[in-house]
Amino acid sequence: MAVKVGINGFGRIGRNVFRAAVKNPDIEVVAVNDLTANADGLAHLLKYDSVHGRLDAEVVVNDGVSVNGKEIIVKAERNPENLAWGEIGVDIVVESTGRFTKREDAAKHLEAGAKKVIISAPAKVENITVVMGVNQDKYDADAHHVISNASCTTICLAAFARVLHQIFGEVSRMMTTAHSYTNIQRILDAATHADLRGARAAAESIIDTTNGAAMAVALVLPELKGKLNGMAMRVATANVSVVDLVYELAKEVTVEEVNAALKAIAEGELKGILAYSIEPLVIRNYNGSTVSSTIDILSTMVIDGAMVKVVSWYDNETGYSHRVVALAAYINAKGL
């Protein structure tokens, strides 16, 4: 039976989670809460997306929004505790406003009647951070009620970092992500951003900024704690990002050995989560990719036998949203 989901925050991730859910028979979105638009506006942005194109579904506005004949309740409530999720049958809330990332704040959805909350962002003092394909076996249905789905960069990195660690071992790693701009940035220069680099026009610069994804990997792979760090370069593209990971191994390897290990896991245990490409593709070719991470096989490098570079692409909206939906289905399967 499909789990009933409510989405709090219908921005880039909220809408992409909905799009992913439409294709998944194990998920039924029954309600959306968002302060920024009425039902007409929400339906329009759901149906027509500047990055991902038109939604292949019938979207109709009535008292709420109907998608493929199923009614979606639309709310505009500022306080999560007032959303009455229980009264409308919501089992799991996807918290995608970016505002309620602390456990005590996200837990207000539980007070409103939801059984579980998935935060679509790195969280603070959450019950657990889960990356599908990496540590979902650590989830405890009885103990974990506020769950973080980590970040898009973390799920990309963790998908192949675990493989490399288990097979080859390492001394240390350094990561850089070239990340498409997001709504937290500015279209034009504005002094309202706490980070002066982040205050600059998103489409006019490559913007050096911090990124917690590397250290956050240790939340799902504790064995990498203190062995991984990194940064981000925000670039002038609307979607899709790429991780460049350089790491020092404890033993010598070849490019062929590294690629063979990654191919094997992508075709086996992590199929649908980790993929690889042997073609000379560019950023636009990965738009719409539903996996967490796609290894660019042609870009793998080895120097002096033990210094290795691996490059992996990820659709930071679509891939991430599909992992949110997969996590919701997994939680439901484990019992609410």
Curated annotation (Swiss-Prot):
InterPro entries per UniProt: GlycerAld/Erythrose_P_DH, GlycerAld_3-P_DH_AS, GlycerAld_3-P_DH_cat, GlycerAld_3-P_DH_NAD(P)-bd, Glyceraldehyde-3-P_DH_1, NAD(P)-bd_dom_sf
This protein's record includes keyword Acyltransferase: no
Reactions mediated catalytically: D-glyceraldehyde 3-phosphate + phosphate + NAD(+) = (2R)-3-phospho-glyceroyl phosphate + NADH + H(+)
Active site positions, chain numbering: C152 (nucleophile)
Residues flagged as site, Activates thiol group during catalysis: H179
Role summary: Catalyzes the oxidative phosphorylation of glyceraldehyde 3-phosphate (G3P) to 1,3-bisphosphoglycerate (BPG) using the cofactor NAD. The first reaction step involves the formation of a hemiacetal intermediate between G3P and a cysteine residue, and this hemiacetal intermediate is then oxidized to a thioester, with concomitant reduction of NAD to NADH. The reduced NADH is then exchanged with the second NAD, and the thioester is attacked by a nucleophilic inorganic phosphate to produce BPG.
Family annotation (PROSITE patterns): GAPDH
Paired cysteines (S-S): none
GO terms assigned for molecular function: glyceraldehyde-3-phosphate dehydrogenase (NAD+) (phosphorylating) activity; NAD binding; NADP binding
Keyword Protein biosynthesis: no
Pfam families: Gp_dh_C (PF02800), Gp_dh_N (PF00044)
Family: Belongs to the glyceraldehyde-3-phosphate dehydrogenase family.
Gene for this chain: gap
Protein name, UniProt field: Glyceraldehyde-3-phosphate dehydrogenase
Keywords: Cytoplasm, Glycolysis, NAD, Nucleotide-binding, Oxidoreductase
Binding site for D-glyceraldehyde 3-phosphate: S151, C152, T153, T182, N211, G212, R234
Involved pathway(s): Carbohydrate degradation; glycolysis; pyruvate from D-glyceraldehyde 3-phosphate: step 1/5
UniProt-annotated location(s): Cytoplasm
SUPFAM superfamilies with a match to the protein in the record: Glyceraldehyde-3-phosphate dehydrogenase-like, C-terminal domain (SSF55347), NAD(P)-binding Rossmann-fold domains (SSF51735)
